[in-house]
Amino acid sequence: MINITRLFDFPYYQQEKFNIPGALVTKHNGVWEKTSSTEYINKANTISRALIRMNIQKDDKIAVISTNNRTEWNIMDIGILQTGAQNVPIYPTISEDDYEYILNHSGAIYCFVSDEEVLRKVNLIRDKVPSLKEVYTFNTIEGAKNWTELLELGKDQSNQDSVEDRKNNVKPEDLATIIYTSGTTGKPKGVMLSHHNIVSDVLSSSSRIPFEPGTSVALSFLPVCHIFERMILYLYQYYGVSIYFGESIDKISDNIKEVKPNVMSAVPRLLEKVYDKIYAKGTELTGIKKSLLFCAIDLGLKYEPYGANGAWY
């Protein structure tokens, strides 16, 4: 069994232990498209081969900016990390000035963006980032380079040995990513995290998993440029959970109905909004329906996860 010490070990562990048909699932043109554990690894290796042919070196920085979570982001993540380079995820909603600052501060050589709006913002400051060689898009946009060009460049497997050498030279203590703060108190701050930093978080979270390994389904919608959701995605991979990526925050309720996930991560404010909406709707009910709803709410308030609330709860 694979010993997980680097972030790119997670997909290989998943393939060896679970090999699920829907490791990563994204909706395209109204259809949920699945990428299996094996396809995930194969495409990540294709990206790694392409990046090496593009002269990416150990400790180079590659920025990835996406307005929503998607399969392509995860493939790029593993493909980048396997070369010994670092993935620099950036919030899609920040200003052009912050893009300029982060891309310069990190020294990003390439940038991958999701859509036309993000591309427009990056192009506005592109000439002010001397290190930036090229910008690629995930969506097909006229006149823009597309990430599929890397999939084509990496098709030739003749340099796969170079990928394996790069992987073998990545140590747990090596830098894996630089995650920038949102910049609400000044310039964004770059947080440097090693492979071990994140791997240890994933492995230590195993005692809290609320799902069945190998058979569960997750819905992912929190921004993966934040360390919480990113760590959770590796945790899902570790436990063979099929990850469905939500289309947008506005479509979460629709996606939940479609996907019927066993688990998803959320933040308190979102849960408060859902609770308030349910509660407000409940106050409009009458009779037995109202009694049943508020009985269920009261029961939920008494739920004690992991026995963590103490004897007086």
Predicted ranges, named:
Residues 24-71, 76-78, 95-100, 148-155, ...:
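Conserved AMP-binding/adenylate-forming core of the ANL superfamily
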Residues 2-24, 42:
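A short N-terminal helical cap/helix-turn-helix that marks the beginning
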Residues 20-22, 137, 155-180, 187, ...:
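Conserved pre-ATP/AMP-binding loop-to-beta segment of ANL
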Residues 34-38, 176-202:
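Conserved AMP-binding A3 loop
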Residues 199-220, 224-312:
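Conserved AMP-binding/adenylation subdomain of ANL enzymes
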Residues 63-65, 73-77, 81-117, 190-192, ...:
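Short beta-strand->loop structural element characteristic of the AMP-binding/adenylate-forming
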